[in-house]
């Protein structure tokens, strides 16, 4: 499949609507996320590495908010624990349809994957050894986030993990501004114009709410996790691994 270039915000828009994962976004998503999220490829590759270490025989691995299935593919190609499977969930029908197409091209003798088009907050999590939330929690209203962490914790087997990747905020204003500016420089270096950066930011401001690493770690501790280790950060994007 040819990767299409993201030009969704290249022309001036009179009315900027809230960002949503519709067919237009799905068509350019691989290009969009590679050019927008510093270290995305490294995060995806190492989700596979981490999942391979913690996947338990006979358990489920969940990719909640799987989009086109990049993390699912990384886990599928790395996990060797017997009788494991992956349950990949997204609430965008367009994302699930395209993920199904991409997974069908991955013809190796890997562990089975079930794709579900569903609200991840309604999915039963049970007998889990690995749960992935890769840039997903930030789109869930903050008052609902602790309940989701508690559900994930309850569904994990002892020794299981949650991999949580997020755009993050900073408590000090000067630190926050520095990382915003560095991220914008990253996007410019990847070919986005100032107009595209500004319009995309306006589309996201009401639907994506970042939090500090400390807030994430405190919430994970409240949910019951024994530790929540920051294993990756590049500018204002980070990933943690939390262990039950």
Curated annotation (Swiss-Prot):
Binding site for S-adenosyl-L-methionine: 40, 65-67, 90-91, 119-120, 134, 201
Secretion signal, residue range per the UniProt entry: none
GO terms under biological process: tRNA wobble uridine modification
Key words, A-Z: S-adenosyl-L-methionine, Transferase
SUPFAM superfamilies the record matches: S-adenosyl-L-methionine-dependent methyltransferases
A molecular function (GO) term: carboxyl- or carbamoyltransferase activity
EC category name: transferase
Residue stretches spanning the membrane: none
Record InterPro entries: CmoA, Methyltransf_25, SAM-dependent_MTases_sf
Catalyzed reaction equations: prephenate + S-adenosyl-L-methionine = carboxy-S-adenosyl-L-methionine + 3-phenylpyruvate + H2O
EC number(s) recorded for this UniProt protein: 2.1.3.-
HAMAP family the UniProt entry points to: Cx_SAM_synthase
Family (UniProt): Belongs to the class I-like SAM-binding methyltransferase superfamily. Cx-SAM synthase family.
Function text: Catalyzes the conversion of S-adenosyl-L-methionine (SAM) to carboxy-S-adenosyl-L-methionine (Cx-SAM).
Subunit (UniProt): Homodimer.
Protein's recorded name: Carboxy-S-adenosyl-L-methionine synthase
Species whose genome carries this gene: Trichlorobacter lovleyi (strain ATCC BAA-1151 / DSM 17278 / SZ) (Geobacter lovleyi)
């Amino acid at each position: 499949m040819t990767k299409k270039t993201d030009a969704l915000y290249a022309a001036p828009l009179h009315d900027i609507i809230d960002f949503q994962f519709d067919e237009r976004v799905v068509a350019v998503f691989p290009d969009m996320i590679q050019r927008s999220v510093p270290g995305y490829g490294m995060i995806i590759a190492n989700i596979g590495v981490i999942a391979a270490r913690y996947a338990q025989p006979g358990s489920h691995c969940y990719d909640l908010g799987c989009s086109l299935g990049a993390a699912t593919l990384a886990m599928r190609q790395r996990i060797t624990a017997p009788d494991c499977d992956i349950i990949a969930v997204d609430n965008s029908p367009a994302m699930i349809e395209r993920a199904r197409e991409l997974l069908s091209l991955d013809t190796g003798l890997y562990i089975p994957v079930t794709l579900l088009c569903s609200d991840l907050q309604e999915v039963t999590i049970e007998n889990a050894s690995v749960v992935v939330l890769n840039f997903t929690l930030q789109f869930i209203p903050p008052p609902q986030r602790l309940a989701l962490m508690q559900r994930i914790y309850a569904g994990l087997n002892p020794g299981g993990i949650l991999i949580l990747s997020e755009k993050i905020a900073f408590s000090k204003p000067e630190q926050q501004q520095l990382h915003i500016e560095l991220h914008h420089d990253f996007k410019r270096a990847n070919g986005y114009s100032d107009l595209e950066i500004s319009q995309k930011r306006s589309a996201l401001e009401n639907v994506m709410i970042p939090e500090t690493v400390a807030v994430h770690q405190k919430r994970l501790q409240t949910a019951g996790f024994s530790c929540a280790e920051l294993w990756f950060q590049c500018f204002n994007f980070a990933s943690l691994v939390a262990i039950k």
